[in-house]
């Protein structure tokens, strides 16, 4: 299973069991973006502008 990850913003193989891609964005010294693989979707926090969780390879491109 592969997802885009930061800071490289390239598609990488996820560790076993981490089969959810995510992307979260928030403001702080400009727009901050974090992408990666997780076992469960992160909780939405009030400072986030955007949170995406998906189970299709590279869906967080």
Curated annotation (Swiss-Prot):
What are the disulphide bonds in this sequence?
Answer: 3-21, 14-37, 41-53, 54-59
On the tree of life, the source organism's domain of life is: Eukaryota
Name one matching Pfam family.
Toxin_cobra-type
Q: Does the keyword Repeat apply?
A: no
Compartments where located: Secreted
Entry annotated with the keyword Disulfide bond: yes
A GO term for molecular function: toxin activity
User: Which terms are listed as keywords in the entry?
Assistant: Disulfide bond, Secreted, Toxin
Which InterPro entries does its entry note? Snake_3FTx, Snake_toxin-like_sf, Snake_toxin_con_site, Toxin_cobra-type
Q: In which tissues is it expressed?
A: Expressed by the venom gland.
Give a GO cellular-component term.
extracellular region
- Say which family it is in: Belongs to the three-finger toxin family. Short-chain subfamily. Orphan group VI sub-subfamily.
> Could you tell me what this protein is called?
Weak toxin CM-1c
């Amino acid at each position: 299973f592969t997802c885009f990850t930061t800071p490289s913003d390239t598609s990488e193989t996820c560790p076993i069991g981490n089969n959810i891609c995510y992307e979260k964005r928030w403001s702080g010294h400009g727009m901050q973006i974090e992408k990666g693989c997780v076992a469960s979707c992160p909780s939405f926090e009030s400072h986030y502008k955007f949170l995406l969780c998906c189970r299709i390879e590279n869906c967080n491109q």
